[in-house]
Swiss-Prot record:
Subunit record text: Homodimer.
Membrane topology: Multi-pass membrane protein
Example of a GO biological process term: lipid biosynthetic process
Function summary: Aldehyde decarbonylase involved in the conversion of aldehydes to alkanes. Core component of a very-long-chain alkane synthesis complex.
The keyword Signal is annotated on this UniProt entry: no
Known tissue expression: Expressed in panicles at low levels.
Primary location class: endoplasmic reticulum
Name of the protein in its database record: Very-long-chain aldehyde decarbonylase GL1-7
Name of a matching Pfam family: FA_hydroxylase
Fatty acid hydroxylase domain location: 133-272
Species in which this protein is naturally found: Oryza sativa subsp. japonica
Reactions it catalyzes: a long-chain fatty aldehyde + 2 NADPH + O2 + H(+) = a long-chain alkane + formate + 2 NADP(+) + H2O
Keyword annotations from UniProtKB, A to Z: Endoplasmic reticulum, Lyase, Membrane, NADP, Transmembrane, Transmembrane helix
A GO CC term attached to the entry: endoplasmic reticulum membrane
Length: 630
């Protein structure tokens, strides 16, 4: 929103929320009626291309968003290296408003302009007129209109909404008040309407012109430099005819320079070109390689989790993952295509996120594999494709000089690699420290148990964290009850003999505190009011309304952590899993040991370090020193 919003700032359908697409319902109904009564033979090229054009524009924009986020995470050709936060993401989510407006105006033009319905697929003379009109009147008028928008009166009421984003993304290009979009539509109509009225317009010329506008807008706001130098060396006048991402980025950081639409020519002749334009272009194009201090290695979960990656769909990745949302089912074809591409081309981990805390830089790498691929039962017990990918990522991190690599989700599965022990033993001279995060995860689980708890039910002990939690509770005088003989026998051999009395096998007792990694299937046996505390990285199925479900082991991150604008899987905003935080703490504290296999950081030590560095528990902290405080 602008600093002092003026008339026509909000979109007319803003009050409709997620139902705003209903404004296109009359158009859809008219199309359906026309198809039912007259058949496909009555559809002319202009009418036929309208809906596909709108859909292709949305796909085109999404490709740019994904490409930009991937490149800025890699950082090499980054232009503006500043933090991006949730406030900006929420402000720029609604790129589809422009598509809806354009759809309505296109259909309106089709209905009232006879020549619109007579356009052929292609006419060269009309396309040339469109190009000339854009290079002349459109670029010229836009330049002066843009300068006018930077006058205090219009800037405070309208254009400041766009400039609230100093760190730009492709989506920033269409984030303007409604009134500005109307003005831009009229401006671009100067290139489209005259050929139509002259009888030389064509459908393809219009579609290509709109695609050109979208391409240049997205490129100018992508925040990484990609225009090759050889283009300007081969044809020097080109620097006056096409801008670069760094050229327009200066407009967002300096505000009163580089006003041109797509052709810097007008900034040159009116002396408003930023003097550092060439230098910033050279520096951004050359780029610098960044070696992160910390890497968190994750992977995709379900097929639809592709959209939840930072390089996926912005409106989805900025919220906790929810596969049950209705529109996710509409995207199934894209999910399947992503899986196929990941299987064919996914030979290594790729960067999806870049963060910073204090002097430490962090990256998130994702393996191009899903849950069902990582834990493929046919590959367990032998070297699986996922194990090879994890090993390759570890060796890449080691070669680059990464200090700490934390294993997320199933990348640390005991059945797969012994919580990372396989790699630590195979490569004893690894400089990068491998972290499974079990120490901090156990500390968070212990901290989540209500004060005064004397008895807990352990549901499953398949994970390192679950076993460590049970042993810690016994050592603190809290009775741990199991109803599985095999698990009971395994745990009893690990609990100190003096504390074995606190480990109990029983089929009759059901305390109201349930802890473990296999809770989902056993929830029906829990008494009313039970508190479920998971030890797994995956969320519980909330099958009971009369029970309380706590989060997976996780903590709130410090306010000083920069560039956080996506959610980690199903966790809330600015919350990280304990396994991921453990890797960060390892680097912050300068700890030298691996935490993998049977090795685990001291629970009290990791908890104290987390609190010291500004991480906060999601629940009220409990003492870790005695059972009575649990």
């Amino acid at each position: 929103m602008a600093t002092r919003p003026g008339p026509l700032t909000e979109w007319p359908w803003q009050w409709m929320g997620g139902y705003k697409y209903l404004v296109l319902a009359p158009v859809a109904m008219h199309t359906a009626h026309r198809l039912a009564t007259k058949g496909w033979g009555d559809f002319d090229p202009a009418y036929t291309f309208m809906l596909p054009t709108l859909l292709l524009r949305m796909i085109h924009n999404q490709i740019w968003i994904s490409l930009s986020r991937y490149q800025t995470a890699r950082r090499k050709h980054l232009i503006v290296d500043r933090s991006l936060d949730f406030e900006q993401v929420d402000r720029v989510l609604y790129l589809d408003d422009q598509i809806i407006l354009n759809g309505l105006l296109f259909y309106l033009g089709y209905a009232i302009i006879p020549n619109f319905r007579l356009m052929p697929v292609w006419r060269t003379n009309g396309a040339l007129i469109t190009i000339l009109l854009h290079m002349g009147p459109v670029e010229f008028l836009y330049y002066w209109f843009h300068r006018a928008l930077h006058h205090h009166f219009l800037y405070s009421r309208y254009h400041s909404h766009h400039h609230a984003s100093i760190v730009t993304e492709p989506i920033t290009s269409v984030i303007h008040p409604f009134a500005e979009h109307l003005a831009y539509f009229l401006l671009f109509s100067i290139s489209i309407l005259p050929p139509i009225f002259m009888g030389c317009g064509s459908v393809l010329a219009g579609v290509l012109y709109i695609t050109y506008i979208d391409f240049m807008n997205n490129m100018g706001h992508c925040n990484f430099e990609l225009m090759p130098k050889w283009m300007f060396q081969t044809f020097p006048p080109l620097k006056y005819l096409i801008y670069t991402p760094s050229f327009h980025s200066l407009h967002h950081t300096q505000f009163r320079t580089n006003y041109s639409l797509f052709m810097p020519f007008y900034d040159y002749i009116y002396n408003t070109m930023d003097s550092s334009s060439d230098e910033l272009y050279e520096r951004s194009l050359k780029g610098t390689e960044e070696t992160p201090d910390i890497v968190h290695l994750t992977h995709m979960t379900s097929l639809k989790s592709t959209y939840h990656l930072r390089i996926g769909i912005t409106s989805i990745s900025s919220k906790p993952c929810n596969d049950s949302v209705w529109y996710m089912w509409m995207l199934w074809p894209v999910a399947w295509l992503s899986m196929v591409l990941a299987w064919i081309y996914g030979s290594s981990a790729f960067v999806v996120e870049r963060l910073k805390l204090k002097k430490f830089s962090m990256q998130v790498w994702a393996l191009p594999r899903y849950n069902f691929q990582v834990m493929d039962s046919s590959a367990l017990g032998k070297v699986s494709p996922s194990t090879i990918l994890i090993e390759k990522a570890i060796l890449d991190a080691n070669e680059k000089g990464v200090k700490v690599l934390s294993l997320g989700l199933l990348n640390q599965a005991e059945q797969l690699n012994g919580s990372g022990e396989l790699f630590a033993k195979k490569y004893p001279r690894l400089r990068v420290r491998l972290i499974d995060g079990s120490g901090l995860a156990t500390a968070v689980v212990l901290n989540s148990i209500p004060f005064g708890t004397k008895q807990v039910f352990l549901c499953g002990s398949n994970s390192k964290v679950t076993r460590a939690t049970a042993i810690a509770l016994c050592q603190r005088g809290v009775q741990v009850i199991l109803n599985q003989e095999k698990e009971y026998g395994m745990l009893k051999s690990r609990v100190p003999e003096s504390r074995a009395i606190y480990l109990k096998f029983s089929n009759d007792e059901t305390p109201q505190i349930w802890i473990g990694d296999s809770i989902d299937d056993a929830q029906g046996r829990a008494p009313k009011g039970t508190i479920f505390i998971p030890t797994s990285q995956f969320p519980l199925k909330k099958a009971r309304k009369d029970c309380t479900y706590l989060s997976n082991p996780a903590m709130k991150i410090p306010e000083t952590m920069q560039n956080v604008h996506t959610c980690e899987n199903w966790l809330p905003r600015r919350v990280m899993s304990a396994w991921r935080i453990a890797g960060i703490l390892h680097a912050l504290e300068g700890w030298e040991m691996h935490e993998c296999g049977d090795d685990m950081m001291t629970i009290e030590k990791t908890w104290s370090a987390a609190i010291k560095h500004g991480f906060k528990p999601l629940t009220k902290p409990c003492s870790l020193n005695s059972g009575t405080d649990l």
